[in-house]
Amino acid sequence: GESLTAVTDAIREKFGIAAAIAPMSDSDVRTVVETPDGPLAFQHYFVRDRCEPCVTGFRFEGASEARPSPPFSAAFEGAGPKMVVVCPSNPFISVDPILAIPGVRDMLQASAAPMIAVSPIVGGKAIKGPTAKMMNELGMPATALEVAKHYADLIDGFVLDEADGDVTDAVRGLGLGVLVTNTVMKSLDDRV
């Protein structure tokens, strides 16, 4: 078969998407959710078990042998990106698997581009998915500040929702720039 990069590019082209889309890797990296009853493949945790088991940790099988995909690496060559944005996704199961691939964290830290993250937690709740539940089960408060702490060694700035404006100074105390704005897109006007 084709590589994930080739398949992703074919889908991008079919949908007429102009922007390049770079998968993290063409290698298999599998997220394993650790629970008191033993490890679960992420698909079993998320779909079969509907995120009900208590989370005690995560493993990213295959990450240590994986390499960044060619377009991912190419994005950091030459002048590199103008900016890197960590979207408001689950830090543990969406972003950490990418950071677990050897060389990715180094590429990000070596880049001259500013790097910002948008909080997936608004008012103590996840916008969607099990992020808040996972944070609580891992012994951390489900707050935007805790997400900022998770990324603090990697990012330059953090975007908070207006509902969490009260932690602005604490996030700045981590050495990060802060933007407080409406981050929740409820209507078409919000999305445009």
Report the location of each language-model feature.
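Glycine-rich nucleotide/cofactor/substrate-binding loop typically near the N-terminus or early
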Residues: G1-D9, E13, A20, G123-G129, ...
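Electropositive, gly/pro-rich neighborhoods at or near active sites that engage anionic ligands
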Residues: G1-G62
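Active-site glycine-rich loop that binds ribose-phosphate moieties when present
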Residues: P53-E77
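Active-site glycine- and acidic-residue-rich loops that bind
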Residues: A63-E65, N90-I101
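Glycine-rich phosphate/diphosphate-binding loops that line cofactor/substrate pockets in enzymes
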Residues: S73-M83, L108-S111
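Structural motif
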Residues: K82-V85, P114, G157
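Redox- and metal-dependent alpha/beta enzyme cores, enriched for Fe-S-associated oxidoreductases
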Residues: L99-L138
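C-terminal functional extensions of proteins
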Residues: K128-V192
